[in-house]
């Protein structure tokens, strides 16, 4: 008999992840109930009709009758109803924990405030280039449990802090916390609380890949890898060499690739490449395969993506910059001949925007702020304009553009105050860029 057969298991949250939990636990002959706090959740039409469903609130009675609760990453474990169930002895886990208990092949785990989707996809492409049967999922693409249906020799998972909160059995072959900057401060008590959730990725990991420029990424206590390697611009195992005006991606004394041969550009992307290379080498991927992937990888949509270029003006969609750290990374080391027209705003999730002040208060940077926290952001720039919407901002700035200028959407905020997702925000920016120029 398997561990879940005839167990009473309540799944909280529908959508892709919740449905993957339903499918998996049905295959394990568990007795399932589903709760979603939304009145009309997405995925309701795909739920088998014989599965009991409660919507609109958390059903405390169902929770207390459960042997196990599989909680959506979108719901905090600190929620009173969940705490009541925990105190009654009910086990609370997430879909990643279910996956880790079932997976029999090595797992690469990637988390961080910024860059994790790029690094996850890079490691996936590196493994593919080496001929490895690899599955990618978690917080990107398909839910992790769906990967169990594929013929995989390796799993590469992007993991959020929310997912890691309820994961106990990861034991990654290689893991990294890319960086730690303020994000989701509406969910965590403080930065340290958020950091501790991230560090769980190192628990029982074979190799930890550390960012030598950010000591907050270093594991501690029980959350440490057995062996570590590091990446940074200088003084690390994986580093960036500058010689005769050219830059090279390095591992120790060996050249991985001249930066000019990589399709990704910008210092923050070079750090992403170094982290991905370290993870790939930790699981035995050879450098030739890594080089092949780096020469062909085109980057991800909405991540510092050139979406339009005309009359010497570049339009960059960095809508995935949903927190301050991501926008700081985009601005660091950015060279522009003319003016930078920076679009900022949305839902700041309680973040401290002051870190942006020094970067954006420069003669060549003009800020156009919009959305729920637009007024807060506008205060940090002496050259700022305030609008209700991004479209209004773009219509205003368009006539001022000159050759050599860049229009950059890197909002430092979530999108949900005005858009269905950061993708929708990026798509609107791209549409406006292409229509208005």
UniProtKB/Swiss-Prot annotation:
Molecular function terms from GO: ATP binding; UDP-N-acetylmuramoylalanine-D-glutamate ligase activity
Database matches in Pfam families: Mur_ligase_C, Mur_ligase_M, MurD-like_N
Key words of the record: ATP-binding, Cell cycle, Cell division, Cell shape, Cell wall biogenesis/degradation, Cytoplasm, Ligase, Nucleotide-binding, Peptidoglycan synthesis
Main location: cytoplasm
Subcellular localization: Cytoplasm
Chain sites annotated for binding ATP: 112-118
EC numbers, comma separated: 6.3.2.9
SUPFAM superfamilies attached to this UniProt entry: MurCD N-terminal domain, MurD-like peptide ligases, catalytic domain, MurD-like peptide ligases, peptide-binding domain
Pathway(s) served: Cell wall biogenesis; peptidoglycan biosynthesis
GO cellular component: cytoplasm
GO BP of this protein: cell division; cell wall organization; peptidoglycan biosynthetic process; regulation of cell shape
InterPro entries attached to this UniProt entry: Mur-like_cat_sf (IPR036565), Mur_ligase_C (IPR004101), Mur_ligase_C_dom_sf (IPR036615), Mur_ligase_cen (IPR013221), MurD (IPR005762)
Presence of keyword Cytoplasm: yes
Catalytic reaction equation(s): UDP-N-acetyl-alpha-D-muramoyl-L-alanine + D-glutamate + ATP = UDP-N-acetyl-alpha-D-muramoyl-L-alanyl-D-glutamate + ADP + phosphate + H(+)
UniProt family annotation: Belongs to the MurCDEF family.
Function recorded in the entry: Cell wall formation. Catalyzes the addition of glutamate to the nucleotide precursor UDP-N-acetylmuramoyl-L-alanine (UMA).
NCBIfam families the UniProt entry points to: murD
Protein name: UDP-N-acetylmuramoylalanine--D-glutamate ligase
Gene name, Swiss-Prot/TrEMBL: murD
